C-alpha cells in the first residue's frame, strides 16, 4: 500500500476501516479539556465503556444476594471464571480446557514453574532472552535459587549481536543445541517488552522439544496484540496479564495456558488450593487434594469477580471484533506509523531518532520502540506536554503502540505532526 503523510489520507483510511467504530466503545483520556493522543495500550489499555455496567451488575447481585450470589447471581460467582474462558482460548489459540483466568502474571508463572521447571543434576539450565521484563528475570533468579542452584550457572541469556538491537532466532536455536543435554526449559516473552520483537514461538518450542526440554512463554505483550496458536504449536505452558491490550484495568487478573498433554495428567506436581480441587466435591471440605483436569487444576483461590467483570467487558469486544481482523488493521496501522515517523526523521537528519523494532511486520506486534540517540528524556517529556501519552523505558527508548481497537489513522497522523513540531523546536533550542 502507498501511504501519504496527510490528514486527508489518514481520514480516508479511517472511513474505510470496518473496525473504526470500536474506538467509541472506550473512554479516551481528556487532560486540561483536550482529548490526548493515547499510544500506551501496551502498558495499560483504555477502559471499555461497558466496564461500569458489568461491575454494577456484580454490586447489585452482592447487595441482593450476599453470599448466595455465588450461586444465584446473574453470572454465578462460583463459576464466574468459566465465562472468560472461550474468548481467552480464542485469543491464544487453545482448547478451552487449556485456559483459565486467575491470579496475576508473575504469580501464575511461579505456580507454573513449580510444575514445569524440574531441574535435575544433569538438566537444570534455562534459556531466556536478555533484557526481558525485570519481573521475569526475578522469577528465573528466585526459582533457580529455590532449587539450590546458581543463576550464573543455570540461566543462559541470549543477547543481540554486537551493534544490533534484536535477538536473532538462529542464535537461540544454536544455544538450545549447544546445551542440549543440560537444558530443562526455554522461557521467552512472546513479544519483547522493550524492542517489540515478536518471536516465532512455534519454532522455539520445536527446538526445545527436540532436545528434550520444555517451552514456556510470557505473553503479556502478545495476548490481544497478535494471533497465536499455542495448542497447535505444542507450547507447554504460558501466562499473561490482561491490563495491557486486554483493557481490564491496572493489576487485574491474569491468565494461563497449560497444554492438554500436561493438564490431563493430574499427577503433575503443583501448589494446590481449593479452587483447583474437583469442583464436584469442592464444598465437601475434604482433606485430600484432587486437582481438576485441565488448566483449572492450577487454580488456588476463588475468582476475584469484580476484576473479572471488567475483563469480561473487554473480552466481549475482542470476541466480536476477532483477533485476526484486529491483526489485519494493526499491520496497516503500525506500518503507517512507521512511514509517518520515517518521513519526519528524514526531514530532520540532525536529530537522531531510530526505530529499533523489527522492520518485518511479521516479526512485531503493534508496538514501535524509538531510541533517542544522543538525546535524553527531555524529548519524551516534551511529547507528553504536547498531549501525547506514550511510554518511556530506561535508558533511552520511547514505546508507541497504535492499538487497533481504539487508535485511528488520524491519531497516527496527528502524532506525526506533534513529533514534527517537537523536532523543529529541538533543532532551534536543543
Curated annotation (Swiss-Prot):
The keyword Hydrolase is assigned to this record: yes
Entry-linked InterPro entries: Kynureninase (IPR010111), PyrdxlP-dep_Trfase (IPR015424), PyrdxlP-dep_Trfase_major (IPR015421), PyrdxlP-dep_Trfase_small (IPR015422)
Annotated metabolic or biological route of this protein: Amino-acid degradation; L-kynurenine degradation; L-alanine and anthranilate from L-kynurenine: step 1/1; Cofactor biosynthesis; NAD(+) biosynthesis; quinolinate from L-kynurenine: step 2/3
EC numbers, comma separated: 3.7.1.3
Protein's GO biological process: anthranilate metabolic process; L-kynurenine catabolic process; L-tryptophan catabolic process to kynurenine; NAD biosynthetic process; quinolinate biosynthetic process
Gene3D superfamilies named among the record's database cross-references: Aspartate Aminotransferase, domain 1, Type I PLP-dependent aspartate aminotransferase-like (Major domain)
Catalytic activity: L-kynurenine + H2O = anthranilate + L-alanine + H(+); 3-hydroxy-L-kynurenine + H2O = 3-hydroxyanthranilate + L-alanine + H(+)
Name of the protein described by the UniProt record: Kynureninase
Organism annotation: Shewanella woodyi (strain ATCC 51908 / MS32)
This protein's encoding gene: kynU
Amino acid at each position: 500500500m502507498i501511504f501519504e503523510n496527510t490528514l486527508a489520507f489518514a481520514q480516508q483510511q479511517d472511513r474505510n476501516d470496518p473496525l473504526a467504530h470500536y474506538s467509541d466503545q472506550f473512554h479516551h483520556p481528556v487532560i486540561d479539556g483536550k482529548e490526548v493522543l493515547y499510544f500506551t495500550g501496551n502498558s495499560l489499555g483504555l477502559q471499555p465503556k461497558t466496564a461500569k455496567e458489568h461491575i454494577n451488575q456484580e454490586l447489585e447481585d452482592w447487595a441482593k444476594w450476599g453470599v448466595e450470589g455465588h450461586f444465584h447471581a446473574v453470572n454465578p460467582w462460583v463459576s464466574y471464571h468459566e465465562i472468560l474462558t472461550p474468548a481467552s482460548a480464542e485469543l491464544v489459540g487453545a482448547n478451552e480446557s487449556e485456559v483459565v483466568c486467575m491470579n496475576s502474571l508473575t504469580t501464575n508463572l511461579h505456580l507454573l514453574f513449580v510444575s514445569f521447571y524440574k531441574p535435575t543434576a544433569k538438566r537444570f539450565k534455562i534459556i531466556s532472552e536478555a533484557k526481558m521484563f525485570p519481573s521475569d528475570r526475578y522469577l528465573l533468579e528466585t526459582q533457580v535459587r529455590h532449587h539450590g542452584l546458581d543463576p550464573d550457572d543455570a540461566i543462559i541469556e541470549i543477547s543481540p549481536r554486537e551493534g544490533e538491537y534484536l535477538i536473532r532466532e538462529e542464535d537461540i536455536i544454536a544455544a538450545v543445541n549447544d546445551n542440549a543435554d543440560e537444558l530443562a526449559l526455554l522461557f521467552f516473552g512472546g513479544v519483547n517488552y522493550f524492542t517489540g520483537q515478536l518471536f516465532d514461538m512455534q519454532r522455539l518450542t520445536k527446538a526445545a522439544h527436540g532436545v528434550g526440554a520444555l517451552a514456556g512463554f510470557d505473553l503479556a505483550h502478545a495476548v490481544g496484540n497478535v494471533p497465536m496458536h499455542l495448542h497447535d504449536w505444542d507450547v507447554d505452558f504460558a501466562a499473561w496479564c490482561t491490563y495491557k491490550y486486554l483493557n481490564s484495568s491496572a493489576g487485574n487478573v491474569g491468565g494461563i495456558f497449560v497444554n492438554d498433554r500436561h493438564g490431563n495428567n493430574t499427577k503433575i506436581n503443583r501448589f494446590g488450593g481449593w479452587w483447583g480441587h474437583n469442583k464436584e466435591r469442592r464444598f465437601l471440605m475434604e482433606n485430600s487434594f484432587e486437582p481438576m483436569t485441565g488448566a483449572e487444576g492450577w487454580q488456588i483461590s476463588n475468582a476475584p469477580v469484580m476484576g473479572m467483570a471488567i475483563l469480561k467487558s473487554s473480552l466481549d469486544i475482542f470476541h466480536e471484533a476477532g483477533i485476526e481482523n484486529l491483526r489485519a488493521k494493526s499491520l496497516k496501522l503500525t506500518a503507517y506509523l512507521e512511514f509517518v515517523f520515517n518521513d519526519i526523521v528524514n526531514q530532520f537528519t540532525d536529530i537522531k531518532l531510530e526505530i529499533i523494532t523489527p522492520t518485518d511486520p511479521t516479526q512485531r506486534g503493534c508496538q514501535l520502540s524509538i531510541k533517542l540517540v544522543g538525546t535524553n528524556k527531555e524529548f519524551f517529556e516534551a511529547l507528553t506536554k504536547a498531549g501525547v501519552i506514550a511510554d518511556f523505558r530506561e535508558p533511552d527508548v520511547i514505546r508507541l503502540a497504535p492499538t487497533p481497537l481504539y487508535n485511528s489513522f488520524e491519531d497516527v497522523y496527528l502524532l506525526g505532526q506533534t513529533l514534527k513540531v517537537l523536532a523543529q523546536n529541538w533543532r532551534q533550542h536543543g
